[in-house]
């Protein structure tokens, strides 16, 4: 079966901007009543709007692509929902729900497609700032439906070097245990003048927006654990189209699946210097203090 990825990208862009985005923008900051997904010692928030938007997306893609599978954050069932080789939409109706609840204008919808478990279409839309970032395999990246001159941006950023980089991090919703301790210890090493000595950290509160910003050349890398496939699927495709790489958060995890749960995403380099990326990744891993592991 031949799949027209460019057409799917166009369809998802229209879905994001015309149907999903207006809901996110109009309802931001209005959801004072919300649920915690995993108990009182977590801050993993879900609102009624998350569920409403996912239902809208599901109905739209099922109408247009009835044979494709669908995985959404709010309909995911642990131990039952699996990614297969079949064409599968993997979506996060509202990525950055905490931002959404607090009316901080960095929530978005993240719409991805995998084929043979590989992210091949990605669409990320932040309606608050009207930013649409999209890509499909072999077709490059677009920003607000226009081809993006990422090479010029990379030239202005210079070489990819750990101690000259700005790194995106997120502590996550779980604030105890070994994973949390590993994150805190790693943050300290990345900042320390004796180890990573990075220029600084940024936390955008949205994995999808973070990966979009890496693809556009505004951040150098993103290290996180605890994410799910719907957090990174769209951004993964977009980043790869501009020469970026996604590996595991733990040292030695050079090849991972989209549902790995731990990730290190790195921007592209001038002239696609893979050795430069490899050194950056290795230097970054040398700052990882512990091991991230999620069920």
Curated annotation (Swiss-Prot):
The lineage of its organism: Eukaryota, Fungi, Dikarya, Ascomycota, Saccharomycotina. GO terms for biological process: inositol biosynthetic process; inositol metabolic process; inositol phosphate catabolic process; phosphatidylinositol phosphate biosynthetic process; signal transduction. Its main location: cytoplasm. This is Inositol monophosphatase 1. It is an enzyme of class 3 (hydrolase). The gene is INM1. Inhibited by Li(+) and Na(+). Mg(2+) 2 binds at residues 92, 95, 231. Its cofactor is Mg(2+). Keywords: Cytoplasm, Hydrolase, Lithium, Magnesium, Metal-binding, Nucleus. GO terms for cellular component: cytoplasm; nucleus. InterPro entries: IMPase, Inositol_monoP_metal-BS, Inositol_monophosphatase-like, Inositol_monophosphatase_CS. It catalyses: a myo-inositol phosphate + H2O = myo-inositol + phosphate. It is found in: Cytoplasm; Nucleus. Responsible for the provision of inositol required for synthesis of phosphatidylinositol and polyphosphoinositides. It comes from Saccharomyces cerevisiae (strain ATCC 204508 / S288c).
């Amino acid at each position: 079966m031949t799949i027209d990825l460019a057409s799917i990208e166009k369809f998802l862009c229209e879905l994001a901007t015309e149907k999903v985005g207006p809901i996110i923008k109009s309802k931001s900051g209005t959801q004072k009543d919300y649920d915690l997904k995993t108990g009182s010692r977590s801050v993993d928030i879900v609102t009624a709007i998350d569920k409403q938007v996912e239902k809208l997306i599901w109905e739209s893609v099922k109408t247009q692509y009835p044979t494709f599978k669908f995985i959404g954050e709010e309909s995911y069932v642990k131990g039952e929902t699996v990614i297969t080789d079949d064409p599968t939409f993997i979506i996060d109706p509202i990525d950055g729900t905490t931002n959404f609840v607090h009316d901080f204008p960095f929530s978005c919808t993240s719409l991805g497609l995998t084929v043979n478990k590989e992210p091949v279409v990605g669409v990320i839309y932040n309606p608050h700032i009207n930013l649409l970032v999209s890509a499909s395999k072999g077709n490059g990246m677009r920003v607000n439906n226009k081809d993006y001159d990422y090479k010029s941006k990379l030239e202005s950023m210079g070489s990819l070097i750990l101690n000259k980089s700005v790194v995106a991090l997120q502590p996550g919703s779980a604030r105890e245990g070994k994973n949390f301790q590993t994150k805190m210890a790693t943050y300290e090493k990345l900042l320390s003048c004796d180890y990573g000595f990075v220029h600084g950290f940024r936390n955008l509160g949205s994995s999808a927006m973070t990966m979009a910003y890496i693809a556009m050349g505004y951040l150098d890398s993103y290290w996180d654990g605890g994410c799910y496939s719907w957090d990174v699927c769209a951004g993964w495709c977009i980043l790869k189209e501009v020469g970026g790489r996604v590996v595991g958060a733990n040292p030695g995890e050079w090849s991972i699946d989209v549902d790995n749960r731990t990730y290190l995403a790195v921007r592209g380099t001038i002239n696609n210097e893979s050795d430069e990326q490899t050194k950056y990744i290795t230097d970054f891993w040398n700052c990882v203090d512990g091991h991230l592991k999620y069920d």
